[in-house]
UniProtKB/Swiss-Prot annotation:
Protein name as it appears in the record: Ribosomal RNA large subunit methyltransferase H
Protein location: Cytoplasm
Catalytic function, reaction form: pseudouridine(1915) in 23S rRNA + S-adenosyl-L-methionine = N(3)-methylpseudouridine(1915) in 23S rRNA + S-adenosyl-L-homocysteine + H(+)
Role of this protein: Specifically methylates the pseudouridine at position 1915 (m3Psi1915) in 23S rRNA.
Matches recorded under PANTHER family: METHYLTRANSFERASE, RIBOSOMAL RNA LARGE SUBUNIT METHYLTRANSFERASE H
Coiled coil: none
Keyword check for Methyltransferase: yes
Record-linked Gene3D superfamilies: 3.40.1280.10
Family to which this protein belongs: Belongs to the RNA methyltransferase RlmH family.
Name of encoding gene: rlmH
Entry binding sites for S-adenosyl-L-methionine: 63, 102, 121-126
SUPFAM superfamilies assigned to the protein according to its UniProt record, in alphabetical order: alpha/beta knot
Keyword rRNA processing found: yes
Class of the enzyme per the UniProt entry, highest EC level: transferase
Length: 153
């Protein structure tokens, strides 16, 4: 199984969260190969200075090239909240799963409609760095639920 976490975020490892991301990638290896793809270019930076709508269009343009294969799931605070068991079902019986984390202005509705699903981790606002860690932990938890591993009790 292959899981991609595709995020609109400036590239580069931060000192605080990067070790946690690497930890979850490592412990997920018996179940799936997990990759994190960070996208942020001059076009996105410029668009964010113009307007929220321009920013969303630039995010869609950057993210759409990853929509071609697998199951595509956007993290969207306005979408259905899921618990860990519902999240695990999203991973079950899939060969490739792509998770999308939008930029500061979220997703265009058109991009969300191209995804197979959109889910929310709740109504709180999390930084991009932190939501990446939460997603990585939930991916590992979901994989362990699906494999009857004792991590989730």
């Amino acid at each position: 199984m292959k899981i991609n976490v595709i995020i609109i975020d400036k590239k580069g490892k931060d000192q605080l969260y990067a070790p946690l991301i690497e930890h979850y990638k490592k412990i997920s290896k018996p179940f799936a190969k997990v990759e994190v793809i960070e996208l942020f270019d001059k076009e996105i930076a410029k668009a964010q200075d113009i307007s929220p709508e321009a920013a969303q269009r630039s995010y869609s343009k950057a993210l759409e090239k990853y929509l071609g294969s697998g199951i595509n799931i956007a993290l969207d605070p306005a979408s259905k909240e899921v618990d860990s068991f519902e999240f695990a079902k999203l991973l079950k019986d899939s060969v490739t799963v792509n998770f999308y984390i939008g930029g500061a202005y979220g997703f265009e509705r058109d991009f969300l409609s191209k995804c197979n699903n959109a889910v929310s981790f709740g109504k709180i606002t999390l930084s991009h760095k932190l939501v990446k860690v939460v997603l990585m932990e939930q991916i590992f938890r979901g994989l362990t639920i699906n494999h009857n591993h004792p991590y989730h009790k």
